[in-house]
């Protein structure tokens, strides 16, 4: 008998704006966070003829709901006002998504991240579901001050984690954190893989002057202030340039600018809204990647650099040590420690490999295998099967 097709509905803030061949009606939308890991997994799952994925997302820049198909995946773009979504604790989302699910009849729902209430919605639908942790807001609250919206999401996260049938998360640290606080959880570790372009980077490191690169959100949590404070101190010691790849955050940069000298500012180049292939291209020349983050579960920027062969100097926090093997493909320092960050940069610059923009070859091969898109797909398929098993129907808390 032919194998039955498994239909999966993703509830996701999917970065549809980044797709290369969008329908005309959607092309003028501004780009959000690229969430490249979702596109990587989707590309892998689209290779499986026994799997059918529907991506359901909500936007407010629409005249009406919109549906289109690409590479066997159907995208359902629904219209909803942001204020109504939050004010209703995502019940507005639930009602809209429930209508779509009644029409497509998914075997399974995949709730991507807590940021827009996806696990709450999935639970309300009454179908088997998987919850994917993209950021651990409870842990963030322990590490850094949270804004009002993130505090709201952190409370919803606690509810969702108490009753999710199957949860996926990335790093060993995240697995340990969740098991310690939610012992009833069924957890499937599934690393989010970088885009294939990062595995194909042809490195030509620039070492005179040293070329630093920083990738990620500009924020206190990501340690942007520590980055500039450290480089201000190093200006008299080292000849360097800094490339910052991020989404624009004019408000944060304006608050940071008075603390940065004009001389250092002239050494910095900002680049925004780059496609994954463009970011991969930018990784050809850096000597070192710098990430002084204060709280990160599994930073995608570190994974991208690790599989590209860029040495990483990063804080030893969350899942970062899963990807940065000290002395082999980078160096670690205590989070929030400016002096430790400075010492790590100085050591890396003098390192026989890192100072030339190189990493240990065996470690590079291991990283590429561990973070491969194919492995990611296998792990998520295992999570789907776990959610469809009879044991998953016995939800830990209703």
Which residue stretches match the model-derived regions?
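Nucleotide-activated donor-binding/catalytic signature segment of Leloir-type glycosyltransferases, i.e.
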Residues: 254-274
């Amino acid at each position: 008998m032919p194998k039955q097709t498994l239909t999966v509905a993703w509830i996701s803030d999917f970065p549809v704006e980044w797709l290369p061949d969008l329908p005309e009606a959607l092309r003028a939308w501004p780009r959000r966070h690229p969430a490249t890991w979702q596109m990587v997994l989707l590309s892998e799952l689209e290779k499986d003829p026994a799997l059918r994925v529907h991506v359901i997302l909500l936007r407010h820049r629409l005249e009406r709901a919109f549906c289109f198909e690409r590479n066997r995946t159907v995208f359902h773009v629904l219209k909803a006002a942001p204020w109504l979504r939050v004010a209703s604790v995502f019940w507005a989302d639930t009602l809209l998504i429930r209508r779509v699910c009644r029409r497509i009849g998914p075997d399974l729902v995949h709730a991507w991240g807590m940021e827009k209430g996806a696990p709450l919605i999935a639970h309300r639908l009454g179908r088997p579901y998987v919850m994917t942790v993209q950021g651990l807001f409870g842990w963030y609250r322990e590490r850094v001050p949270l804004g009002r919206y993130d505090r709201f999401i952190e409370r919803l996260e606690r509810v969702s984690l108490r009753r999710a049938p199957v949860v996926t998360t990335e790093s060993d640290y995240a697995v340990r954190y969740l098991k310690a606080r939610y012992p009833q959880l069924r957890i499937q570790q599934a690393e989010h893989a970088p885009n294939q372009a990062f595995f194909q980077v042809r490195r030509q490191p620039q070492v005179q002057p040293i070329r630093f690169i920083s990738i990620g959100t500009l924020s206190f949590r990501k340690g942007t202030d520590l980055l500039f404070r450290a480089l201000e101190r190093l200006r008299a010691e080292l000849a360097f340039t800094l490339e910052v790849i991020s989404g624009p955050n004019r408000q944060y940069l304006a608050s940071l600018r008075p603390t940065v000298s004009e001389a250092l500012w002239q050494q910095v180049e900002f680049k925004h809204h780059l496609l994954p292939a463009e970011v991969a291209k930018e990784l050809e020349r850096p000597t070192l990647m710098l990430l002084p983050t204060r709280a990160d579960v599994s930073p995608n920027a570190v994974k991208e650099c690790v599989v590209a062969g860029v040495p990483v100097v990063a804080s030893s926090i969350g899942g970062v040590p899963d990807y940065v093997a000290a002395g082999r493909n980078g160096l670690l320092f205590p989070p929030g420690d400016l002096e430790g960050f400075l010492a790590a940069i100085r050591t890396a610059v003098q390192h026989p490999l890192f100072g030339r923009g190189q990493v240990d070859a065996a470690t590079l091969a291991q990283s590429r295998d561990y973070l491969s898109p194919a492995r990611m797909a296998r792990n998520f398929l295992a999570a789907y099967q776990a959610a469809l098993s009879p044991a998953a129907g016995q939800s830990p808390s209703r």
